[in-house]
Amino acid sequence: MDTKDYLNGKANDAYGYFGPVKKTKGYMFRICIPHARKVEIIGDFNDWQPKKMRGYASGVFTITIKEAKIGDRYQFLITDANDEVIKIVDPFAQEIIVEEKCSVVSDNSYKFKNKKLKTDKLNIYEVYMGSFLDSDFDGLIKYAKDQNFTHIKFMPVSEYINYKSMGFTSSGLFAYCKRYGSALDFKKFIDKCHKEKLGVLIDLDLAHFDCDPYYIKSLEEYFAYDYDDVKYSYYGDMNFDPTKNFTKSYLKSAVNFWLKEYNLDGIMLTNVENMIYWQGDEARGENDKWIDLLGDLIEEIHQNKSLALASFNGIYKYDFDFDYCLDYSLRPIIRSMQDLPYKRDSYKKEINSLIGSDNSKKILGFNYIDSFLDEASLFMKINGSNDKYKQYKPMLTLLYSLKSEKLLFTGDEIGSEQIFSVYDRIGLDKLSEDQVYLNDFYKDLSKLYLKKEELNHVDSTTKLLDVEGYSLYAFIRSYKEKKLLVIINFTDIDYEIKSSYDLVELINSSDLKYGGKGNINGKINQNETIFIEDFGSCVFEIKK
């Protein structure tokens, strides 16, 4: 990397230049702080006695320490014009010990054996790494495969200070969180996933950073990555300033780092409304500079032949070059299921619009927010007491029959009653009989989604049918000459519908094997009656 490129906002590989860089003997350390009078380094390799670094006109300070080795802790000491000295953590450190506020020389020697996943179908399993701290991660791979997920997406895995939070506010964008284990173990896990044809994605929040004075904030008097005026976001964190060239290089390098050094299949940029709008507030207008930088970050991801994904806290209507975006499109479904069954017909216009929309550029599903909002898991949000499992199945049927990519949060596939919390593990091993039935239904439904081009092909189409009934929906999913009929009943009334087609039933939530009453249809001839049980759902293959 050329230092000029970093200062001009053109660098995407700064992580290989700054921080500790392996040499024949020892390591070279670099940091860029143009307005510092003096920079020193202390660490295990020099008994924590300050050693002066050489400064250059560019603002880069450098030193080679032959005694430095993997695992050594270190800090930088910065002296300003008033002879004030502060200790800081290396902003490019790839390993940080939060409790000691120090950087660590890390081992970057791992070589991946398996290539990234190539697939045009996404069924994403969203995971909070903290929920699996004491688990066998090889078991997670097997579990995700058994559940027909194509990718595991981890909520933020970069280092953060407040372990009571979910990790979206990073204190070290280049450091894997030590709470979750070692970077080496995570790389090996990713390699095993690829061997099993399972993709790995991570969340990355690049709009703001932690305001702890030992981290990036400590540079604000010298080389500030934040705005000079509007420093804090509405979360209370510090905003990255996209107008500053070194901020551009820093963020582009962070994206490139995770994709190259961890061989990830993609990155989901989270809370992108915080980039698109000033302070995340649509009423304050668009942030043109962030929008420009967002385009650069997306291009960076695509140059790594990876998926550029986004999550948006609202209904996403922009035309950026993201491959797919996760938004709040399914919130009407959740609201309707929270209501009494006889009131759900009032949501028909919204749900019909959702069914008829082309969501081929969206990831639809239920994420972690849906499992703690209103202090209830997704499953527990459903109105009622004795028939929640029965009602949950048509929700899943609707999701997996819409034209979109899919995402579920940990536990959604079993109807978990557990509210998501950073303090608790989500139990996936000891299932009730109802959860086993529900999970069997989910596995067959997701398998159908992955198998049928009528459901997963980008050129498939949807035709909404006009059927009589409260909260009753019917539509046809087609690809070329192949067609499927989907019928979903969100209310507690049985329905009989005269069939316009010859049909073969592929899945029915009322099947005995899913804990239902066994009111299935099997083969249906034209003009015969289709029976849809209360809170039932089914998918048919149309023969003619």
Short names for language-model regions:
Residues 31, 76, 127, 154, ...:
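Conserved, mostly hydrophobic/aromatic
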Residues 70-74, 519-544:
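C-terminal beta-strand-rich structural cap/linker in extracellular carbohydrate-active enzymes
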Residues 426, 431-439, 445-447, 498-522:
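C-terminal accessory region downstream of the catalytic core in glycan-modifying enzymes
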Residues 32-39, 46-48, 491-492, 500-501:
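Short proline/glycine-enriched turn/loop motifs at strand-loop junctions of beta-rich domains
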Residues 1-28, 33, 48-126, 131, ...:
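The feature marks proteins involved in alpha-glucan
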Residues 429-464, 536:
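Aromatic- and carboxylate-lined catalytic core of secreted/periplasmic carbohydrate-active enzymes
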Residues 115-118, 128-289, 293, 297-303:
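Substrate-binding/active-site clefts of carbohydrate-active enzymes
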Residues 86, 93, 97-99, 263-265, ...:
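Conserved alpha/beta catalytic core and glycan-binding cleft of carbohydrate-active enzymes
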